[in-house]
């Protein structure tokens, strides 16, 4: 080893120590999560929930559109029917170990029953615990759309009224009257 190589090596070490010393007092980029809350954008897509309508009933009508729209196939459900003809999911299951939180299920839902919330704390120790059933997904409130009630808008919630007499619903069109 020559003297020149020793001086170059020594200079490299001094430069490295100098840079470490400069960065030791710089502002830290790492956030200490539990103590310091993380900013989430307004449209952040996190945990999926099933909401209820303002009357307290489930919004989901088991139309299966969310399961069809899901690109990874992590949603499964089975339709059942009540005495008054309303559909509801007998079981509703989401496998969060497969979910990519794309939000296509929320867009496909005609009743706004399935919604993505900003909750992201879903860590589990076993994969089996990431399979959520309907009881785990249902929340007590209406979520993002507090006044929306699918059956009231569709004309099925009010007993004794015909189609076209619900809120914000146009009267049925008599197709024969349009003929020449």
Curated annotation (Swiss-Prot):
Going by the record, the broad EC class of this enzyme is translocase
Supply the EC number(s).
7.1.1.-
UniProt catalytic activity: a quinone + NADH + 5 H(+)(in) = a quinol + NAD(+) + 4 H(+)(out)
Assigned GO CC terms: plasma membrane
Compartments, record wording: Cell inner membrane
Classify the protein's membrane topology as the record does.
Answer: Peripheral membrane protein
Q: Name the cofactor(s) required for activity, per the record.
A: [4Fe-4S] cluster
Q: Name one GO biological process term.
A: aerobic respiration
What's the superkingdom here? Bacteria
State the family it belongs to. Belongs to the complex I 23 kDa subunit family.
Q: How does it assemble?
A: NDH-1 is composed of 13 different subunits. Subunits NuoA, H, J, K, L, M, N constitute the membrane sector of the complex.
In Swiss-Prot or TrEMBL terms, this protein is called: NADH-quinone oxidoreductase subunit I
Organism expressing this protein natively: Shigella sonnei (strain Ss046)
Query: What is the gene called?
Result: nuoI
